[in-house]
Amino acid sequence: MKRADVLATLEMVASDQWGIVTTGQAGREGIERLQLSRLAERGDLDRARHGVYLLPSHQGGPHDEIRAAWLSLEPKKFIDERWEDEQPVVVSHESAALIHGIGRLVPPNLTLSTEGTKQTRQQGVRIHTRRDFPEEDIVSVDGLPVTSVALTVGDLAEAKIERGYLADLVADALRKEGVRIDDLASKLAPSARYYEAKSGKQLVAELSAEASSVEDRTEWINRLALVPRIINARAEEQLKRWDPDARIWR
């Protein structure tokens, strides 16, 4: 197969998976590992991680590392086959929060979950196994399976993260379209006692209020920081209008 044909085939395979392809997927199309290595050496492909390549059509983004890691866990399966798995591997916890754009946690690892059992030797990848989550709690974010916003918050609460971080997550989650307070409260209910609340609803109310208070205080501090600048700007403007010879303001 000629170089142009190889690249065209790879682009077809990766068209629905962010311009990323694995050696296993390429092998199913008759493309050998050595061919991929040579294309990478020529600069036609970029290595994302072991056995995972970025194609020329790939557009870099903040979720590339998570996507590449997810694909590498089942390297011979195409993305549509992954979605059909009875026990799919989905992005969860801190990584899911990053994907959803909620909270301010910095994920120490790439975190995923599955209802079954799954192991990986990849460094920096953690998989929670034997999970039990309803189908509606797995959502697609640009084709990537991710735990829902509500379940993501609930998972992190069960991980006993600091209260302030959880408050940020709750506040951001409530701003997301389609996130219902009742769903969020239900997911937080198992952790309510740990955070000294009697119910999930009470915990949602308390954390939402705390986050709003912090936001208001931050906004007030930012406004106060502007006061000296405003005063200095006005003083400078006044000085420009002063005529020292005539001793008058113009």
Predicted regions and their residues:
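Short gly/ser-rich loop at a beta-strand->alpha-helix junction or flexible surface loop bordering the NTP-binding
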Residues: 2-148, 155, 159-250
